[in-house]
């Protein structure tokens, strides 16, 4: 058995090497970006959900730069961020341009910190992204709090930290955080009240044969509050009919859009995949911003897509397609391939309403030009 496993492993390594060599030849020495590395990640038993998100984040340059900068800070005790910075540093400092790296340390730490991921089952890539970004933000805020208490940050207002005031934003917030404003207009007195809500990613509903722009328009549709759902107006001091809508008040540097492709079907007693065809453009301008938006005309470029392959949330596979400099790459665990920009259309989804196996965009990463 051991001999068979060894032979299988050697064959796998040979395949990885051949793939890496082919990629390097296809890009060519003159076109290969300076100081760039394209490394696949070994799958440790259904960890494609993790590998695909890590590759997408690695090619979100502002995020990569912050993680690598964290590596150069004084050594801290091991946590998910130190493991991530070690992994990114390992990729960025390889002598070879292409190859494969095992993210074993990161996966081990992830499984130790969250029981949701402590198994060999397929997990949801969006849940992992959400957990990772929030965990990194928590780590950075806790470290900042400790530095203030130890007097390493001048004018650190420790009292503020202890009075339940909002902690200082971290570079995770600077990169990914946007703000939504929930506007409610009373139809009796016309008074508008608004409530702000921060987000690190936006989850949008999907419909058949539509586009991301259409999905975002649906996200901001006006809803009428009436009957038993009437709104309590402070001005009228009674429940009134009202119009409610969500708008974007502050756009993030990197906009992460999650397409809600998994829907619970009562008759099946399980989640099924909506393989609907949803077109996502290479360039995006958001239109559903509030009147006092800080940057209403921000233009975005698509830099990465996490793709779900399969028919349901707990089965199937995840891959990532990323833009690096002027070309596109497909990362499928340890395999890395160069693809044409036109090939991205293959990941829009299917025109059939039937739940089938499909390769469809699940999380989109758009980076602001300014």
UniProtKB/Swiss-Prot annotation:
GO aspect biological process, one term: regulation of protein stability
Family annotation (CDD domains): Peptidase_C19G (cd02663)
Domain of life: Eukaryota
SUPFAM superfamilies: Cysteine proteinases
Compositional bias per record (Low complexity), positions renumbered to this chain: 155-164
Active site: 48 (nucleophile), 317 (proton acceptor)
EC number: 3.4.19.12
GO cellular component assignments: cytoplasm; cytosol; nucleus; plasma membrane
GO molecular function: cysteine-type deubiquitinase activity; cysteine-type endopeptidase activity; metal ion binding
Keywords: Hydrolase, Metal-binding, Protease, Thiol protease, Ubl conjugation pathway, Zinc
Catalytic activity as recorded in UniProt: Thiol-dependent hydrolysis of ester, thioester, amide, peptide and isopeptide bonds formed by the C-terminal Gly of ubiquitin (a 76-residue protein attached to proteins as an intracellular targeting signal)
Residues of the USP domain: 39-369
Disordered: annotated span: 145-167
Residues that bind Zn(2+): 186, 189, 233, 236
PROSITE patterns in alphabetical order: USP_1, USP_2, USP_3
Similarity field: Belongs to the peptidase C19 family. USP12/USP46 subfamily.
Functional note: Deubiquitinating enzyme. Has almost no deubiquitinating activity by itself and requires the interaction with wdr48 to have a high activity.
Summary of subunit composition and partner proteins: Interacts with WDR48.
Official protein name in the record: Ubiquitin carboxyl-terminal hydrolase 12-A
């Amino acid at each position: 058995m051991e001999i068979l496993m060894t032979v299988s492993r050697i064959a796998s390594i040979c395949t990885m090497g051949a793939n890496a060599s082919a990629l390097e030849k296809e890009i060519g020495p003159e076109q290969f970006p300076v100081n760039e590395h394209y490394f696949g990640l070994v799958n440790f038993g259904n960890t494609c959900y993790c590998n695909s998100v890590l590759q997408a984040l690695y090619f979100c340059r502002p995020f990569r730069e912050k993680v690598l900068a964290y590596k150069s800070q004084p050594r801290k005790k091991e946590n998910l961020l130190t493991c991530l910075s070690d992994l990114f540093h390992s990729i960025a400092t390889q002598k070879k341009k292409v190859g494969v790296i095992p993210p074993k340390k990161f996966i081990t730490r992830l499984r130790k910190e969250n029981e949701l991921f402590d198994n060999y089952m397929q997990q949801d890539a969006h849940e992992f992204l959400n957990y990772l970004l929030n965990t990194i933000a928590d780590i950075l805020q806790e470290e900042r709090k400790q530095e203030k208490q130890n007097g390493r940050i001048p004018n650190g207002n420790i009292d503020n930290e202890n009075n339940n005031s909002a902690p200082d934003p971290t570079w995770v917030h600077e990169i990914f955080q946007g703000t939504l404003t929930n506007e409610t207009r009373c139809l009796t007195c016309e008074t508008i009240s608004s409530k702000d809500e921060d987000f690190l990613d936006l989850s949008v509903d999907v419909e058949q044969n539509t586009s991301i722009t259409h999905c975002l328009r649906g996200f901001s549709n006006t809803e009428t509050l009436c009957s038993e759902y009437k709104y309590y107006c402070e001005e009228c001091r009674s429940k009134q009919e009202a119009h409610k809508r969500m708008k974007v008040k502050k756009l993030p540097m990197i906009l992460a859009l999650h397409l809600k492709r998994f829907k619970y079907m009562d008759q099946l007693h399980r989640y099924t995949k909506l393989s609907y065809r949803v077109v996502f453009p290479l360039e995006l301008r958001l239109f559903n911003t509030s009147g006092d938006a800080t940057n209403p005309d921000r233009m975005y470029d698509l830099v990465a897509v996490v793709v779900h392959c399969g028919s349901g949330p707990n089965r199937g596979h995840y891959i990532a397609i990323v833009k690096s400099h002027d070309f596109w790459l497909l990362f499928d665990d340890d395999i890395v391939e160069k693809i044409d920009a036109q090939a991205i259309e293959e990941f829009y989804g299917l025109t059939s309403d039937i739940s089938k196996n499909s390769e469809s965009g699940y999380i989109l990463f758009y980076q602001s030009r300014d």
